[in-house]
A protein has these predicted regions:
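Conserved short alpha-helical segments that host acidic/polar catalytic motifs at enzyme active sites
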Residues: 1-179
């Protein structure tokens, strides 16, 4: 099975700092090198805090819910009721991000044989802008979706990568195709 395990690395810092950390390099070394000749899925995200405390590990991406691992770029404006002033001032550690709430909500549908239909219905019921990538745990696929038209991708026979920002540097991803 392609996804027999999901390994997560996340940190609360700027991407340029994160990728230069020794812990990140060790993470890649320990987890990627043994997979380069096998199927491999990597989902990454850097988070601009719009709501939910950045100091709460569970709010930082990739997000893990019971049945879903995913990333979200954008903002959902109708998923939570909370004191927006506390969020804007980063005062509340316990406020969940809109992304965490989103993935927890769709996690309920993960084992439904009509998951895609339920997912699309859910997307149509929420307010906000999103580009989302997710994996239902144990499934051999990644689902990507956007309502703001910003999904950029590269595809070859055995390689697919995507981004929600046009300015992504494809060179590191393309280097993986030459293994």
């Amino acid at each position: 099975k392609l996804f027999d395990q999901t390994i997560i690395y996340k940190t609360n810092e700027k991407p340029t700092k994160a990728i230069n950390r020794k812990t990140y390099k060790n993470f890649l070394e320990q987890n990627l090198q043994k997979k380069l000749n096998n199927d491999l899925q990597i989902i990454g995200q850097t988070r601009l805090v719009t709501n939910g405390s950045k100091f709460s590990y569970k709010n930082n991406q990739p997000i893990e819910s019971e049945n879903i691992v995913g990333v979200h770029n954008g903002i959902f404006t109708d998923l939570q009721q909370y004191d927006k002033k506390k969020t804007q001032n980063l005062e509340s550690y316990n406020i969940k991000s809109d992304s965490l709430t989103f993935f927890e909500n769709i996690s309920k549908y993960a084992n439904d044989q009509n998951f895609i239909s339920k997912y699309v219905e859910y997307l149509q019921s929420i307010v906000g802008n999103y580009s989302v990538a997710l994996q239902v745990r144990g499934e051999n696929k990644v689902i990507i979706s956007s309502n703001c038209g910003s999904l950029y991708y590269y595809f070859e026979k055995d390689f697919f990568c995507f981004a929600s920002e046009k300015k992504i540097g494809w060179a590191p991803a393309l280097a993986l195709t030459n293994h």
